């Protein structure tokens, strides 16, 4: 007598691509499987969604050989319901916003600067907000770990993923900013009252208190200048991150593949005007220009001594801002990169490829 065992999901009918088939050795009258084996087969071979109960069919086929007549094989099948050990799932193929607080189900994207961070900025009305997640064909919800859906405005909230939604209560209409950190399992929602603001810089031209004082909001347009631009001024539009308007991202792919490299600084303006729109003039009768502007660049060697530093590709480095002569004459040697990211809140710079 020879025995063959088969294991499969109940509805697979012991298909050739799904069944676990074993031809048992002589004298073997039992078959066991470890929890790890069943879990791996469920996930990889049978594509059972994580944390879903499923039913297995186990079949034994006994075949008789060597007698004077043919004997039909005996077949016995039993069914077993398996409840997997619960796995703490926190991943996503797609993240959206839904609920009565938003006009329609809206997919939200990862930020360019941080692949673990989803961000969204837009209009919400009074109502309930949910965060549905699609993962391996199943729908889950990102919910507060403590089950409390009250808006904790601007605060970090620990979250988890469940099959049942818990809604955040949006108490007033307006533009909200929502951040989901998939690595730290935290959500932060900013209302209009607590929302992050763009950087605004107030300075005296050239840093001399006797020169006019100006205020420049940093909304995305910067002026590149240095050997890398041929000592000409390049007006470049950086895109404020959805996560924080003080994170400015230049994506070469959105600018016909144009990449800026070489020694350069990032100035706030190339010219200055008064309240009537007239150019601000120096004592020599010439207008103030980019060379007198506040700029972002590498740290100077000292408060009075400039320097030039190579910016390593793929490494977050220190960004310095100022208007002194030492700062205005210091330059980062920027490598060719797909992305150039200036974090003005934390004063860092990163050039990296996608």
PLM regions and their residue ranges:
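Insoluble glucan recognition modules
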Residues: 1-6, 13-17, 24-354
């Amino acid at each position: 007598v020879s025995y063959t065992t088969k294991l499969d999901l109940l509805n697979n009918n012991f298909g050739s691509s799904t069944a676990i088939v074993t031809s048992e050795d002589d004298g073997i009258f039992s078959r066991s499987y470890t929890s790890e084996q069943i879990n791996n087969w469920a996930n990889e071979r049978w594509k059972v969604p994580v944390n879903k109960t499923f039913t297995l069919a186990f079949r034994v086929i006994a075949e008789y050989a060597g007698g004077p007549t043919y004997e039909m094989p005996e077949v016995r099948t039993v069914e077993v319901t398996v409840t997997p050990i619960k796995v703490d799932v926190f991943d996503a193929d797609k993240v959206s916003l839904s609920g009565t607080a938003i006009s329609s189900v809206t997919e939200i994207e990862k930020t360019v600067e941080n692949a673990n961070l989803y961000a969204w900025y837009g209009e919400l009305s009074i109502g309930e907000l949910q965060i549905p997640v699609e993962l391996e064909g199943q729908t889950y919800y990102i919910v507060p770990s403590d089950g409390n859906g009250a808006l904790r405005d601007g605060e970090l909230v620990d979250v988890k993923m469940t099959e049942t939604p818990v809604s955040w209560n949006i108490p007033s209409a307006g533009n909200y900013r929502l951040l989901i950190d998939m690595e730290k399992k935290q959500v932060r929602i900013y209302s209009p009252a607590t929302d992050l603001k763009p950087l605004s810089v107030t300075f005296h031209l050239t840093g001399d208190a006797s020169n006019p004082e100006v205020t420049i909001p940093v909304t995305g347009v910067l002026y590149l200048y240095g050997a890398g631009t041929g000592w000409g001024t390049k007006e470049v539009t950086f895109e404020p991150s959805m996560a924080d308007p003080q994170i400015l991202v230049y994506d070469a792919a959105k600018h016909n593949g144009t990449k800026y490299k070489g020694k350069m600084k990032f100035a706030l303006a190339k010219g200055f005007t008064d309240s009537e729109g007239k150019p601000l003039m120096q004592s020599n009768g010439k207008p103030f220009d980019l060379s007198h502007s506040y700029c972002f660049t590498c740290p100077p060697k000292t408060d009075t001594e400039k320097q030039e530093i190579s910016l390593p590709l793929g490494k977050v480095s220190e960004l310095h801002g100022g208007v002194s002569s030492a700062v205005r004459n210091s330059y980062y040697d920027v490598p060719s990169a797909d992305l150039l990211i200036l974090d003005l809140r934390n004063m860092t710079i990163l050039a990296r490829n996608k």
